[in-house]
Amino acid sequence: MIPGEILHGDGDIPLNAGRPVTRLTVLNAADRPVQVGSHYHFAEANPGLRFDRAAAHGLRLNIAAGTAVRFEPGIPADVELVPLTGRRVVPGLRGETGGALDA
């Protein structure tokens, strides 16, 4: 082994395996692109995005950590969302949740 070397197994590692997936169509009604990061509470995303916010409550994008999805103006996009896990507390952001998701 070389110091700092990372050894990993063969094959792909599935993202969010076993988590329920919610599919929504999102339309960017704004006049410029909007980007949403992997762990952002999707229901509180930019108000220029049109989608079922109630269905997105407590969910985040089903994408790799540290990545984002860019929504171009006027172009509908289908997304997959998975539940936020851990303590399920969302402080701050746009102030619509401001704490525990399950309260």
From Swiss-Prot:
Keywords: Cytoplasm, Hydrolase. One of its GO terms (molecular function) is urease activity. It comes from the Bacteria. Its EC number is 3.5.1.5. Pathway: Nitrogen metabolism; urea degradation; CO(2) and NH(3) from urea (urease route): step 1/1. GO terms for cellular component: urease complex. It catalyses: urea + 2 H2O + H(+) = hydrogencarbonate + 2 NH4(+). It is an enzyme of class 3 (hydrolase). Gene3D superfamilies: Urease, beta subunit. One of its GO terms (biological process) is urea catabolic process. The keyword Cytoplasm applies. CDD domains: Urease_beta (cd00407). InterPro entries: Urease_beta-like (IPR002019), Urease_betasu_sf (IPR036461), Urease_subunit (IPR050069). It is found in: Cytoplasm. Heterotrimer of UreA (gamma), UreB (beta) and UreC (alpha) subunits. Three heterotrimers associate to form the active enzyme. Belongs to the urease beta subunit family. PANTHER family: UREASE (PTHR33569:SF1). This is Urease subunit beta. The lineage of its organism: Bacteria, Bacillati, Actinomycetota, Actinomycetes, Kitasatosporales. The gene is ureB.
